[in-house]
Amino acid sequence: MKRKPAVAGLFYPSRRDELVEQIRICFLDKRIGPGELPDPSETKLQSPIGFVSPHAGYIYSGPVAAWGFLEVAKFGEPSVVVIIGPNHTGLGRPVGVWPEGEWETPLGTVPVNQRAAEIILNSSRYAEEDFMSHIREHSIEVQIPFLQFVFGDVSIVPICLMDQSPAVAEDLANALTKLVAEFPSVLIIASTDLNHYEDQRTTLRKDSYIMEAIRNKDPRLLYEYLVKEDISMCGYGGVATLLNMNFKNARILKHATSGDVSGDKLEVVGYLSAILF
């Protein structure tokens, strides 16, 4: 089954040339972005990498996302990319894995790695084959043009989470650990924005707690802060999955808010790029 783009022309340009230029602008942005284009390693990725990436419209979160894609490119090309995104639509299964076929963007199509999807489905108590949760969801889709820009051909496994409980995060981490046994060069993207629609000062404070949990690689601390500090982070389940995977290192690459782009600091959304390796 081929998934057509749901948010081309909304979150990013629908024309190929305009999309390529928009992604270039995100990388070359020197105020919020890294100010340089990626130079992918000619080698293959040697070990698993986790990547926390934002998923708003490219003009807002693209420069922050570019920091992560720039860094990931230095590690080498992955054999498969698992993209875990939160379910914003309420459609589909609690943990929906797109099992086969391909996803289309204005830059072309990327295949779903059927074998990798099969391993995850067979290793998880919660994951189910599901197309409906993905049809209108943007959080996974917006990562793919960046992947195509950096790596060209790459295969993916999209996972959409309506259930982002600690039990699901731990279960998915175990399933992905089994995936690593067959696909050691996997890149796992946790797609999330951080605190939503509060003022800049409040969002910077709340987002700092999320970054602390990531630096400490502590999923329990992440969930504690979400409740204690009332943080409206949308994709915490994917991040908690990464934090359950026993990565040795975690590095914050860039944090900014929508207010840093628009100048409106009264209601902002927080964006983060971080890697775990």
UniProtKB/Swiss-Prot annotation:
Alphabetized InterPro entries for the sequence: MEMO1_fam
Stretches assigned to coiled coil: none
Pfam hit, one: Memo
Xref: Gene3D superfamilies: LigB-like
Signal peptide: none
PANTHER family found in the cross-reference section: PROTEIN MEMO1
Family: Belongs to the MEMO1 family.
Protein name stated in the entry: MEMO1 family protein Tpet_0837
Organism annotation: Thermotoga petrophila (strain ATCC BAA-488 / DSM 13995 / JCM 10881 / RKU-1)
